[in-house]
């Protein structure tokens, strides 16, 4: 062998190795799954390359994974005839360059995640150190010579050109020198069970080098001769009886042979009725690196002008990086006639279904298809359309079981709402899957379909309110009249609801109407209409006074027919942002500051003519239009309405000061008795004309 070069592990990898070696994990068995998975990936790569250049397979025409337990040396060897690694690959991939998932995996472990998640973070190779204290990797790539990588995980590793070892032709051989307490992993039975449990559905043959003891039977001729010579015992017997009574001598002989462990053909090629739940679960785990079983599965084939088979899985929970836009999707593996092509095809499924895992095997796509030509491929567009249709079918199947659907909705409701926003073609279908709390649903969630069945006679609109939380909206002044008249209102309290509802204008012909925007019209009797007109006339003067005081803060002031108990509320324009949307947009770190100006609707102040505060204010305004207490109370009511209507205050301190002044008035504390710190506080307008000019208006 040539001289060895020594390299130091990159700091994060060193930390990871230290964590793996020094922490006790009960499920160390996952190392085999990870190493077989890596071998499978290497085989995928060489098979893909060979589609356009058959000579790539010359070094080793067969594609396989071999597992060799060695009880004499206490080693476990895994060999694959995959693409192999160059010297640069060895140095970079196995030690000096940390993958992006290294740090995230350590953070996940620290947060109590299971070590079996290691494959999801792209650092599965290092799981070998769960069971081995030394690992030797021999590898041969078509573009380089054969090299040996070796490390006991003590902070460094060596790489040597292999001049004397057995030639691999092409591929990788990994020898694990097992720790003393991990000898179970050289037991045939244990290894077979592990392959069947975790790697049954790998697309390449996985063979185990097994020891067989066979017994050879040799007839004992000498004993037979003695029998024949015995005196007085010569009898006539038939030939069959003679054969049965022949004595045999057994000799034990030990042999070795390859035993194929994963005998199943690809699961998607079998009929769904032939596959049990456990097989689907095992396939899902090997496909997704998840340690939990799936929530639901859809196995189907499409035939006709276009042929493909697919299996789609819905996980039980959302992955940690579900909405990570920088991460390439790898949820659907694309095969062409059983040959793996790629697992990061962005065009095969829309973003909002990025949580669905699965495999698609097409009979029609060309084997040598590239990512560039995929984008233009009409067949792929048809496959995508079918996958979306089948995903939605699967979600409706999950919805038949309330408990399962609650789990699904908790994990993936944001994806469905994103679908409403993005997928105009299936918007109506996705809308049927949405669930909300409402004024009549209690702790249960209700669907739009169920809402429609409960609608009052003559009701033609679906009412909803958006806000920060259920608690924040359930006692909103906007709901007072609706509740009083017996209308059900949906609570849309997820930030993404604002975006989704902007696209979902109606459901089953019923318009969706916001309780917080202009344009809310409720059915009225003739008496109610007459009374409303009278009150409108009676409070016209006060509306004008309030508008004069507030100026540009509001677009108009009108008599409300939506508030029953509260003195007033602030509604937004039908096509502008709601208070909740304004709050969401203000929280956007990279927002366009110019957008806020024209999208933040002008507010309309609606006053409640039957509220005692408003009635008293009307009397004061009629008695003296210039009464300064009217101005102060109007400002206070406006700021309070901002809060109860879901807006934020631009100057909360000034609002606080007004409240404190009110408290002093209520407690009959004279201004002279106030502490000096209150000197800057805006006084109430009725205290003194001179001080009135100090009053600050607040937006």
UniProtKB/Swiss-Prot annotation:
PANTHER family: HEAT SHOCK PROTEIN 90 FAMILY MEMBER. The lineage of its organism: Eukaryota, Viridiplantae, Streptophyta, Embryophyta, Tracheophyta. One of its GO terms (molecular function) is ATP-dependent protein folding chaperone. Molecular chaperone which stabilizes unfolding protein intermediates and functions as a folding molecular chaperone that assists the non-covalent folding of proteins in an ATP-dependent manner. Residues 219-248, 673-699 are annotated as: Disordered. InterPro entries: HATPase_C_sf (IPR036890), Heat_shock_protein_90_CS (IPR019805), HSP90_C (IPR037196), Hsp90_fam (IPR001404), Hsp90_N (IPR020575), Ribosomal_Su5_D2-typ_SF (IPR020568). A motif (TPR repeat-binding) lies at residues 695-699. The TPR repeat-binding motif mediates interaction with TPR repeat-containing proteins. SMART domains: HATPase_c. The modification Phosphoserine is found at residue 219. It is found in: Cytoplasm. This is Heat shock protein 90-4. GO terms for cellular component: apoplast; chloroplast stroma; Golgi apparatus; plant-type cell wall; plant-type vacuole; plastid. Homodimer. Interacts with OEP61, OEP64 and OM64. Residues 219-228, 673-690 have a biased composition (Acidic residues). The keyword Nucleotide-binding applies.
